[in-house]
């Protein structure tokens, strides 16, 4: 899908546990401005939604696993209408950069709660949280063509 970056993350393991690089400024032309982490319970869906201006940099390393769903909803994109579903998380550590106009959402598919880290390139609600959120919340539209079941 045009503009979507999917990078398999390598867990370097030893007797102490593991370490994985999740973002390097010398690998991608992407500059995070904030970060957050979320935990999602088994069977719970987050999204789908999209952004007009913001790109997300999702990091799925566990615990837990997700089905990540992506739909290209960009009017003039060369991959408009394309759909992609991948399993990410503890079993498939992955970093995914999602550009504006790509509808995205994920569902926890593990028994245990699953964690996701996001490093978006725009501040949520802008400087000092004084702006409208850059979100088209497809999950609130019962007629949405974008469904995660």
Where are the language model's segments positioned?
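Short, exposed beta-strand "edge-strand" segments with a Pro/Gly-rich flavor and a Y/T-containing core
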Residues: 90-98
